[in-house]
């Protein structure tokens, strides 16, 4: 029977302290090796919180699976911001370009329920609503209406 430990760690900066150490300690594996592998696999997500799954089998071998950061973290990293707006409906903190929205959608594509790039970009726009981020200088809901009307079909074709 394999034990599974799921944690959120800073990309490329996991350490043996909480939350990893206390969760992995009782399993009897080399925590330093696990931390090194996590840091190696998450170095591309530097500055973002990344979901990580450590699977330990009965013979104390482990595998590390790295998820993608939340969509909100990817949007904020594209804009080089720390956090979203406290009042997202009235105070907008930045604006994504359509290209940035497509990039975020493609990074999250495997974890999304959307079948098409167009719908994936609309999911990203939905996240932008709660963050107080505009897209192409427009409120996210206006942007979604334009996407539905086909304005960006040339960029959203697969």
UniProtKB/Swiss-Prot annotation:
SMART domains: RL11
Keywords recorded for this protein, A-Z: Ribonucleoprotein, Ribosomal protein, RNA-binding, rRNA-binding
Pfam families documented for this protein: Ribosomal_L11, Ribosomal_L11_N
GO cellular component, one term: large ribosomal subunit
Gene Ontology molecular functions: large ribosomal subunit rRNA binding; structural constituent of ribosome
Domain of life: Archaea
One of the GO BP terms on file: translation
Gene3D superfamilies for this protein: Ribosomal protein L11, C-terminal domain, Ribosomal protein L11/L12, N-terminal domain
UniProt cross-references to InterPro entries, sorted A to Z: Ribosomal_uL11, Ribosomal_uL11_C, Ribosomal_uL11_C_sf, Ribosomal_uL11_N, Ribosomal_uL11_N_sf
NCBIfam families: PRK01143.1
Record's subunit section: Part of the ribosomal stalk of the 50S ribosomal subunit. Interacts with L10 and the large rRNA to form the base of the stalk. L10 forms an elongated spine to which L12 dimers bind in a sequential fashion forming a multimeric L10(L12)X complex.
Function: Forms part of the ribosomal stalk which helps the ribosome interact with GTP-bound translation factors.
Family designation: Belongs to the universal ribosomal protein uL11 family.
Matches recorded under PANTHER family: 60S RIBOSOMAL PROTEIN L12, LARGE RIBOSOMAL SUBUNIT PROTEIN UL11M
Name of the protein: Large ribosomal subunit protein uL11
Organism of provenance: Methanocella arvoryzae (strain DSM 22066 / NBRC 105507 / MRE50)
